[in-house]
Amino acid sequence: VEPIKKGLDQVLKGASVVLFALLVVIVVWQVFTRQVLNSPSAWTEELARYTFVWVGLFATALVFSERGHIAVDFVVDKFSPRVQKVVAVCVQLSIILFALAVLVYGGLRAANGAWNQSLSALPTQVGVMYLAMPIVGVLIAFYAVYHLQAVLRGAEEAIAHEEDPQVV
């Protein structure tokens, strides 16, 4: 499972970098055509919006991969290691449920419902753009299962702590 996770991490990192670079180019082109040419490009705003959404969702999956999401753990830190493990299992199960129910199922329904709707400025359907949700839902569910099994077998701490905490 570890090689699959590392491979997915690399693909997500690469896709995020490419999409972010594309987003920068799109926005620069949009500003250039609007301010310099006085003829704003019709497609840039729509493409920038959807590119931003895809970058944000892919980055969310990467954060789940690294267990870097926000966690309020000051209460859980007070519990015994056994209770911390139970809480961690419940959290990962909740993440799996949310990812599958909302992102995968809901995302597929949204994509299916919008499949015949065309974007106004781009030659594609809205449903294609909505496919980011189920894709990211599957990735988040995979990462949650990965962390769940790692916590259960003791390979990861029940609560993810910063490796190098910064005290301000």
Model-flagged regions — what are they?
Residues V1-V168:
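Alpha-helical transmembrane segments and membrane-interface helix-loop junctions
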